[in-house]
Regions:
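Non-catalytic pre-domain segments flanking phosphatase-related domains
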Residues: 1-16, 99
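Short, ordered coil/turn segments that flank beta-strands lining enzyme active or ligand-binding pockets
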Residues: 18, 31, 97
Length: 100
């Protein structure tokens, strides 16, 4: 069994990518060439539960599809960053803005 040497109770925010994290690593394509992103219902429930318990949540993805925005905003996540090819500065700014 592994050991974690930090206090998980101090975690106040979570940042997630979509592709391969909140969706399968394989992305089917529509005939138009647009990616079809499939999401797991259980992930959505877990994200809503985390919000309910006061965690700050951000979605940070290089993809830029309306369906991704609609899905995560529909779960109550207000910080959805689409088209983020360079993610670190966006995440750092989000952390500063949220006191994390």
């Amino acid at each position: 069994m592994s050991s974690i040497d930090y206090d998980l109770k101090k975690i106040r925010g979570l940042v997630f990518d979509v592709d391969g994290v909140l969706s399968p690593a394989v992305i089917p394509m529509y005939p138009t060439g647009e990616p079809m992103r499939m999401v797991n219902i259980k992930d959505g429930y877990a994200l809503q539960l985390a919000l309910k318990h006061g965690y700050k949540i951000a979605i940070l993805t290089g993809g830029n599809t309306k369906a991704v925005d609609v899905r995560f905003r529909g779960l109550g996540i207000t910080d959805v960053f689409l088209g983020a090819s360079i993610k670190l500065p966006i995440m750092q700014q989000w952390m500063r803005d949220n006191g994390l």
